[in-house]
Amino acid sequence: MNQHYSETRKIDPSRGATLGDNTPNDNNRIEIGPTQLAFGEWATAGLALPDLQRMREFRWNRLTQAVVDRDYGGVLMFDPLNIRYATDSTNMQLWNAHNPFRALLVCADGYMVIWDYKNSPFLSTFNPLVREQRFGADLFYFDRGDKVDVAADAFSNEVRTLIAEHGGGNMRLAVDKIMLHGLRALEAQGFEIMEGEELTEKTRAIKGPDEILAMRCAVHACETSVAAMEHFAREAVPQGNTSEDDVWAVLHAENIKRGGEWIETRLLASGPRTNPWFQECGPRIIQNNEIISFDTDLIGSYGICVDISRSWWVGDAAPPADMVYAMQHAHEHIMTNMEMLKPGVTIPELSERSHRLDEQFQAQKYGCLMHGVGLCDEWPLVAYPDQAVPGSYDYPLEPGMVLCVEAAVGAVGGNFTIKLEDQVLITETGYENLTSYPFDPALMGR
């Protein structure tokens, strides 16, 4: 068999040494990223690409400054999304979420060390900000059995040595999520353990210019994927024998096609299964002239979360009047609440001034008015007035924050729930709704 050079070459000569996002134009590279399909769609849409080298440096600088500002020796992270934020590297993210084998230490001088799976230390080598790759942070029972304490002692000693060298010997160490033996071992080394999530969540809350560009690209890819799902649903459901899972599978596939990574939940339901909300997507056959409601919770291109929700009426008959009213009411709810968004407004003020849903929808209203979003659902959370805890979120909004504004509108004992959600950027002067996906005109009564 003849093998042609065009089939094996590593670089596309039409693109130069780097792609438009300033990552290597190498077909065999280690780091993951958007696909050619995604790049082509973004170019057609006129979207500017992020500079990933600059984005990584921005994130690293924010983390390092956060450590210094709090007078810590460093921050030790096990959460795979905190590690993604700091290094932009991934390794079996969902498996890692319940088997924490990865750890990352950012010291007060910016020195960054990752502990990775021993067979794949190369997965972060594309990022020069990661100065060392080690292994040995897997402190869970499956991996260590009855000798977890021995591994934890060795790991904690490495952390102590690194903080002595790169954290000024400051024994105040922020930690986000850690297994029990790891915590005990760090304390035995003399560390004062500080709340790492407070540091990482507030650091991640402000998005830099390149993160915002990456999010715009991710939103476009998500909305394109949602459009494919809607097209499939409207074509297939009236023909019969199309399940919720069939529809949901389209979003998964379209996300992966564009370099997206996973979907956090299974929040797509149809007909009476939409009420109460939070029933998971399943094998139910969707009937003609029924509602479909969903929440993307999608980790998409560049690892950016796009968290939007829509409800569709699928069929040839008109939706019932009470459903149209609920849709209009939900739309009014999120749009009225969105109008409050601007720098300087505090989270308690957002709660206090929020639009009030009708009494019939109070019992099953959503768990929050708004929440932050970046690599996943993030800090802060804006609670409904009757659920707000005084003192828990006494902070103002700042430019660069991104919030999801949402509503779940369905009456107790009803046969539907409307689910709506848009993703919104806080600007210097107000807000910008990053979401452009249309609302179902039939449900809007148009």
Swiss-Prot record:
UniProt-annotated binding residues for a divalent metal cation 1: D295, D297, D307, E421
GO molecular function (one): dimethylpropiothetin dethiomethylase activity
One Pfam family from the record: Peptidase_M24
Keyword field contains Lyase: yes
Known cofactor(s): a divalent metal cation
pH dependence, entry free text: Optimum pH is 6.0.
Membership in a protein family: Belongs to the peptidase M24B family.
Subunit structure: Homodimer.
Name this polypeptide is given: Dimethylsulfoniopropionate lyase DddP
Source organism per UniProt: Roseovarius nubinhibens (strain ATCC BAA-591 / DSM 15170 / ISM)
Lineage, broadest ranks: Bacteria, Pseudomonadati, Pseudomonadota, Alphaproteobacteria, Rhodobacterales
